[in-house]
Amino acid sequence: TRRSSDLVGEIGLDYYWLKTPEERANSRDFFDAQLSLAEELNLPAIVHDRDAHRDCLDIVRAHPGVRGVFHCYSGSLEDAKVLVDKGWMLSFTGNITFKNARRAPDILRWLPLDRLMLETDAPYMAPEPYRGQRCDSTMIARSAETVAQLRGLTRDEVEAVTLENGKKFFGIA
């Protein structure tokens, strides 16, 4: 029986810091093994993907039995559609409030609400107007406001649906 705290993650690929082909290959191998473990144990995964969208998606595709959430999602709309079709959730941080968040608006307008989660990624990713400051949970309302504006909803509606999605994901609903 799965307990609400049982999951695999945070796992994934972060090419921002890994520059050599050897480092990246090693990271891919570990990520693949971690998804294999999630598949074997039938546990959801929390995936970190920074500057490694193609490789991350390819490895996830190789594990069709795994579901979970891509945290701090920054991929494309096309990749979002693939992930949602495979049963994944997408979580967004304060970076959706940034002026240079070019991909996020289209994704957030398209994304089925039952696949949406919000997070702080504290202490990083503080939303505007707090960008550059230490992020904390009080700031998540700014991200919810951004989603609400894009979707024609109220902030309360966005907060309610993302709270419910989080409870379901973590098995505490």
Task: Give the location of each predicted region.
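Short acidic/histidine-rich active-site segments
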Residues: D114-D136
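Non-membrane alpha-helical structural segments and their capping/turn regions in soluble enzymes
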Residues: P21-D32, R50, R134-A141, D156, ...
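Short, small-residue-biased leader/transition segments that mark boundaries at the very start
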Residues: T1-S4
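Divalent metal-coordination and catalytic microenvironments
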Residues: E10, A38, H71, L83, ...
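Mid-to-C-terminal alpha-helical segments outside catalytic/metal-binding sites
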Residues: L37, M139-A173
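Catalytic pocket-lining loop regions of alpha/beta-barrel enzymes
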Residues: R24-M117
